[in-house]
C-alpha cells in the first residue's frame, strides 16, 4: 500500500477567526505538508491543507473528522485526492 495526498478545504466560522491560530491548530491536529490561504469574499479566507495519509480505508475521513473538531472551523471538506 502507498500513500494518498489529499487537499482539504477548511472554512472558518467567520472572518474574525485568527487565521494564524487556526493554521497552528490544523498543524497540531493532522500531519500537514502545506497550508495555503484562499480568499472567499467579504473578508472570509479559507485554508487549503495538503495532507499525506496511508492508503487505507477511512484514513481521509479521519483527517476530515479531526479538522472539523477544531474550534473556529465551520467545515472541512476533501476537495482533491491522489495516490503518491
Swiss-Prot record:
Keyword terms: Elongation factor, Protein biosynthesis
Keyword Kinase recorded: no
Coiled coil: none
Transmembrane portions of the chain: none
Stretch forming the signal peptide: none
SUPFAM superfamilies in the cross-refs: eEF-1beta-like
A GO molecular-function annotation: translation elongation factor activity
Functional description taken from the UniProt entry: Promotes the exchange of GDP for GTP in EF-1-alpha/GDP, thus allowing the regeneration of EF-1-alpha/GTP that could then be used to form the ternary complex EF-1-alpha/GTP/AAtRNA.
Alphabetical list of HAMAP family matching this protein: EF1_beta
Family per record: Belongs to the EF-1-beta/EF-1-delta family.
Identification of the protein by name: Elongation factor 1-beta
Gene expressing this chain: ef1b
Amino acid at each position: 500500500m502507498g500513500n494518498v495526498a489529499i487537499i482539504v478545504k477548511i472554512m472558518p466560522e467567520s472572518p474574525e477567526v485568527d487565521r494564524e491560530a487556526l493554521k497552528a491548530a490544523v498543524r497540531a491536529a493532522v500531519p500537514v505538508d502545506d497550508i495555503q490561504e484562499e480568499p472567499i469574499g467579504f473578508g472570509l479566507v479559507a485554508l487549503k491543507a495538503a495532507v499525506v495519509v496511508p492508503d487505507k480505508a477511512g484514513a481521509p475521513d479521519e483527517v476530515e473528522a479531526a479538522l472539523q473538531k477544531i474550534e473556529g472551523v465551520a467545515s472541512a471538506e476533501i476537495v482533491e485526492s491522489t495516490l503518491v
